[in-house]
UniProtKB/Swiss-Prot annotation:
Localization per record: Endoplasmic reticulum membrane
Protein name: Vesicle transport protein USE1
Gene transcribed to yield this protein: Use1
GO-annotated biological processes: Golgi organization; protein secretion; retrograde vesicle-mediated transport, Golgi to endoplasmic reticulum
Side of membrane Lumenal, spans: 243-250
Keywords: Coiled coil, Endoplasmic reticulum, ER-Golgi transport, Membrane, Protein transport, Transmembrane, Transmembrane helix, Transport
Organism: Drosophila melanogaster
GO molecular function: SNAP receptor activity
Length: 250
């Protein structure tokens, strides 16, 4: 209960201080200040330790409000009956609701004034624009038509350039593909010719090797027959020489 009452007092004090900035609201603040007196008296009667520390600050702010608005205390007893004490919170809440309604109505009035001022300025500006646009509407239409034509030409030229660029890229790609195919075919032919030549060389080398073997075998046989003939001739010569020498001695 004390916490809620503290919150209501702080909120009501802040709203009253905001309203006290304008002298036109002084007459409205009388009953709110009276409600604050009642709420502070109820808070003192509760005897809450935390609330007791805050009460002097509340009283200072309330006294400043009274001085600034010229509030006059109504004479009467400050003692409260139990029924009056139970109605303090309702009185504070009603005062808060009324202050909020006042603030909302004030904000609504200010917003309405701003909107009315903006609408008047818009009407004046629209009249000036209509007077100026009526004289230059033909020029605007002509310039807009020229701008549209220029934009269409620009986009047409851009599309043509893009198309030409794509065609040139396609031609270059086709030429490069054909060149690569020719190079690949030429390299394939060279490789196939080289493979054929290698096969032929291997075959010829095999044949030459066979011929060399045959020649070497023939040469070996010739030398062998020559050696045999030489040995036989030498043997015959020795026999003849020995017979001739015997005849001479005899």
């Amino acid at each position: 209960m004390a916490t809620k009452l503290n919150v209501n007092i702080r909120t009501l004090l802040a709203n009253c201080e905001e309203l006290a900035k304008s002298e036109q609201n002084f007459w409205r603040l009388q009953k709110f200040i009276k409600s604050l007196d009642t709420m502070l008296a109820e808070l003192e009667a509760m005897g809450d330790p935390q609330s007791v520390k805050r009460i002097p600050g509340y009283l200072e702010r309330l006294q400043a409000l009274k001085i600034s608005t010229g509030y006059a205390d109504v004479p009467g007893s400050t003692t409260k009956t139990p029924s009056q004490s139970s109605a303090v919170s309702e009185t504070g809440e009603n005062a808060l609701k009324e202050i909020r309604q006042l603030q909302n109505s004030k904000y609504h009035n200010e917003l309405r004034k701003e909107l009315l001022q903006d609408s008047d300025a818009l009407r004046r500006r629209r009249g000036a624009d209509e007077s100026s646009s009526s004289s230059g509407s033909a020029n605007v239409q002509e310039t807009s038509g020229e701008n549209m034509n220029q934009a269409a030409k620009y986009y047409t030229n851009a599309q043509e350039k893009i198309t030409e660029h794509m065609l040139s890229l396609t031609r270059n790609l086709k030429e490069q593909t054909e060149t690569a195919n020719r190079i690949i075919r030429r390299d394939t032919e060279v490789v196939s010719r080289s493979a054929g030549m290698a096969d032929r060389n291997i075959n010829s080398l095999g044949k030459e090797a066979e011929k060399l073997e045959q020649h070497s075998k023939k040469a070996y046989k010739c030398w062998l027959w020559l050696m045999i003939a030489f040995v036989i001739a030498t043997f015959i010569g020795m026999v003849l020489f020995m017979k001739i020498m015997k005849k001479k001695k005899s």
